[in-house]
């Protein structure tokens, strides 16, 4: 889920989510895998990643959350005035979600749109080349989008800082196996 916020609202939304949203939700309505604020690319956004055992479980838990009085009476009234729009992607992982070995990272979420019928072959090729790519940095997860943006693949990378990201990407681009991919 991606929220696009009014300019300047990120700190308020982050604090509200940390202090109130997490207290209400915990992992009782889906497991929170990550929560990020954008600083490069589309600005004024908060991206959060939730995992569920199935689409049916997601629907059931979202229904239960919508009946939670604290969610609807306390959290949403503080969030909604800051929200301009939201985007929801339903994604299936083909590289399992895994937390990075260290904290305090910057994250890069890359999304690509494939031609119709080409997303699954691309994802398989990407999964196959992952051992080569992970010689340089570990992938935090990769997904095929089922809804929101069909024919889209997203993957997430953690780096200690932007300089390390630039250096890592430069090394990856020099790898002959990666170049073949």
Where are these regions (language model features)?
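Short S/T/G/P-rich N-terminal loop/turn motif that feeds into the first structured element of a domain
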Residues: 1-180
């Amino acid at each position: 889920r991606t929220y696009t916020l009014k300019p300047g609202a990120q700190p308020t939304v982050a604090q509200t989510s940390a202090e109130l949203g997490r207290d209400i939700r915990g992992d009782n309505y889906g497991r929170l895998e990550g929560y990020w604020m954008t600083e490069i690319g589309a600005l004024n956004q908060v991206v959060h990643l939730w995992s569920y055992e199935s689409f049916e479980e997601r629907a059931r838990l979202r229904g239960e959350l919508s009946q939670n009085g604290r969610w609807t009476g306390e959290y949403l009234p503080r969030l909604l005035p800051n929200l301009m729009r939201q985007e929801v992607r339903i994604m299936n992982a083909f590289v399992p979600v895994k937390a990075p070995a260290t904290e305090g990272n910057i994250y890069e979420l890359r999304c690509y749109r494939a031609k119709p019928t080409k997303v699954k072959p691309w994802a398989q090729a990407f999964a196959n080349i992952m051992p080569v790519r992970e010689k340089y940095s570990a992938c935090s997860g990769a997904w095929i989008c089922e809804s929101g943006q069909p024919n889209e693949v997203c993957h997430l990378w953690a780096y200690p800082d932007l300089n390390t990201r630039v250096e890592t990407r430069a090394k990856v681009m020099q790898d002959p196996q990666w170049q073949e991919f």
